[in-house]
């Protein structure tokens, strides 16, 4: 296992990190696994999106050396002295962040680097990160991004085929668009001492991803948990050689709620640090998001109002991490969403 070259001290100005009791791995809720080379893959993907909003993919086609190299480069960055890392922050939203998650008071036992995944829309903070890191860091990010994007396109095109969405690239073209608002996030969760009464620190609090799809890969340290239909939390066994796919809020809307955006969180491990890398596939800011007419022909049957990605992104940025953000865009907002998750 790759480890950080030196202990990491997070921002000491923030001391109140939320805690939870650990949850067991619930074997009754086996995480769906999809072999992308399987002729039945598209059927399995849709079933997983309907039942969990989450699944693991194997035989994904991303070269293992790219995954390992980007992890090593991330470890190198997070192992830098704090003063050097701070030059890449604070995030706006791109750049380096430490404990603070967003602008509305959410905190976690985490440091992270958020990079714009679209070279056509390079941000000043992303450029600053590349200036302060070796050339191999940028090369690793760019090569990894090329291959992970192909995974996301393939998954979305399989979804379209299985649901009968025409044309086949209806979903994937939003991510292929030169103005796609996608990003890559590198997370580092340092090992954290166990709190009193066996409580553990929250690395990243419960939330859903607002984009269309998220593709996650981590090292072999546990911590990721998802919320299943009965409201219980399930610990996801780590697998450094595979990817985990999350349904995002935008895809939930486009399928009119048939797919569910999965609520998830990360708890800090008390023994080992965790490195994760997530590609968030988002559409262009001007893209209209609404139930797809080929799936829901009558607008009276739509559960959601039409909105642009820019509108939703702006709304999400003003909310707390755990807020039910889609509630503002439902045609008949739920009075008590907590009873339904």
Curated annotation (Swiss-Prot):
Protein's pathway: Plant hormone biosynthesis; gibberellin biosynthesis
Residues engaged in binding Fe cation: 207, 209, 264
Catalyzed reactions: gibberellin A1 + 2-oxoglutarate + O2 = gibberellin A8 + succinate + CO2
Cofactors named for this entry: Fe(2+)
Enzyme class: oxidoreductase
Positions of the Fe2OG dioxygenase domain: 179-283
Note on how the cofactor is bound: Binds 1 Fe(2+) ion per subunit.
Residues the entry annotates as binding 2-oxoglutarate: 274
GO biological process: cellular response to hypoxia; gibberellin biosynthetic process; response to red light; response to red or far red light
E.C. number: 1.14.11.13
Tissue note: Preferentially expressed in flowers, siliques, and upper stems. Expressed in cotyledons, at the base of the shoot apical meristem and developing leaf primordia.
Keywords: Dioxygenase, Iron, Metal-binding, Oxidoreductase
InterPro entries, per database record: DIOX_N, IPNS-like_FE2OG_OXY, IPNS-like_sf, Iron_ascorbate_oxido_reductase, Oxoglu/Fe-dep_dioxygenase_dom
Annotated catalytic residues: 274
Up-regulation conditions: Up-regulated by cytokinin, auxin, paclobutrazol and gibberellin A3 (GA3).
Example GO molecular function: gibberellin 2-beta-dioxygenase activity
Function in brief: Catalyzes the 2-beta-hydroxylation of several biologically active gibberellins, leading to the homeostatic regulation of their endogenous level. Catabolism of gibberellins (GAs) plays a central role in plant development. Converts GA9/GA20 to GA51/GA29 and GA4/GA1 to GA34/GA8.
Family classification: Belongs to the iron/ascorbate-dependent oxidoreductase family. GA2OX subfamily.
Protein name per its UniProtKB record: Gibberellin 2-beta-dioxygenase 2
Species of origin: Arabidopsis thaliana
């Amino acid at each position: 296992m790759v480890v950080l070259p030196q202990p990491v001290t997070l921002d000491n100005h923030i001391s109140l990190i939320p805690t939870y009791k650990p949850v067991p791995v619930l074997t009754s809720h086996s995480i769906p696994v999809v072999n992308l080379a399987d002729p039945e893959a598209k059927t399995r993907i849709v079933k997983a999106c309907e039942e969990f909003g989450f699944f693991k993919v194997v035989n994904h086609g991303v070269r293992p050396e790219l995954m390992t190299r980007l992890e090593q480069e991330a470890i190198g960055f997070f192992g830098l002295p704090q003063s050097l890392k701070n030059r890449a922050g604070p995030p706006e939203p791109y750049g380096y962040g430490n404990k603070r998650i967003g602008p509305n008071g959410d905190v976690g036992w985490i440091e992270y680097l958020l990079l714009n995944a679209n070279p056509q829309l390079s941000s000043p903070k992303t450029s600053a990160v590349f200036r302060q890191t070796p050339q191999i860091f940028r090369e690793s990010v760019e090569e990894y991004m090329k291959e992970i994007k192909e995974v996301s396109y393939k998954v979305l095109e399989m979804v379209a085929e299985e649901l009968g969405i025409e044309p086949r690239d209806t979903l994937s073209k939003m991510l292929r668009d030169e103005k796609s608002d996608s990003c890559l996030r590198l997370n580092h969760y340092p090992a954290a001492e166990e709190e009193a009464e066996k409580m553990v620190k929250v690395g990243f609090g419960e939330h859903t991803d607002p984009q269309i799809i998220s593709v996650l890969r981590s090292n072999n340290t546990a911590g990721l948990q998802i919320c299943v239909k009965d409201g219980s939390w399930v610990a996801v066994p780590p697998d450094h050689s595979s990817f985990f796919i999350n349904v995002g809020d935008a895809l939930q809307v486009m399928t009119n709620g048939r797919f569910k955006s999965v609520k998830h969180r990360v708890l800090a491990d008390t023994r080992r640090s965790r490195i994760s890398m997530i590609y968030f596939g988002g559409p262009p800011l001007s893209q209209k998001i609404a139930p797809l007419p080929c799936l829901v022909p009558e607008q009276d049957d739509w559960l959601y109002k039409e909105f642009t990605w820019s509108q939703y992104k702006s709304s999400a940025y003003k909310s707390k991490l755990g807020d039910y953000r889609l509630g503002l865009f439902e045609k008949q907002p739920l009075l008590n969403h907590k009873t339904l998750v």
